[in-house]
């Protein structure tokens, strides 16, 4: 299993990001929100933090945890655009405990 996160996999470009937000399906959790756009030719991912989270240290820690979660579970995500928005509740969890099998859709279906 390739657990790397190459730069080519990071979603970039203002137009593409705003298009992804408009055409996405949303999955909610207490710790983060996942937005996904499935019909896209390659796997792209974006990591963000809610605006409510104050302090650069907290925001950076949340993004680090999200990247780690994605890297470790990369094979469970379909090809498409994935946007992870972290919430402050994520800081209360240890990095090795972040695992949400209930909200990760299987590779075969739409949901």
Which functions belong to the PLM regions below?
Residues 1-111:
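Positively charged, solvent-exposed patches that mediate nucleic-acid binding
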């Amino acid at each position: 299993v390739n657990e790397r996160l190459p730069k080519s996999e990071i979603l970039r470009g203002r137009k593409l990001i705003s298009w992804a937000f408009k055409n996405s399906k949303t999955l909610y959790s207490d710790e983060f929100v996942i937005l996904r756009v499935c019909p896209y030719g390659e796997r792209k991912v974006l990591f963000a933090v809610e605006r409510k989270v104050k302090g650069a240290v907290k925001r950076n820690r949340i993004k680090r945890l999200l990247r780690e979660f994605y890297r470790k579970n990369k094979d469970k995500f379909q090809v498409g655009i994935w946007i992870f928005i972290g919430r402050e509740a994520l800081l209360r969890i240890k990095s090795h405990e972040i695992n949400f099998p209930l909200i990760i859709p299987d590779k075969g279906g739409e949901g």
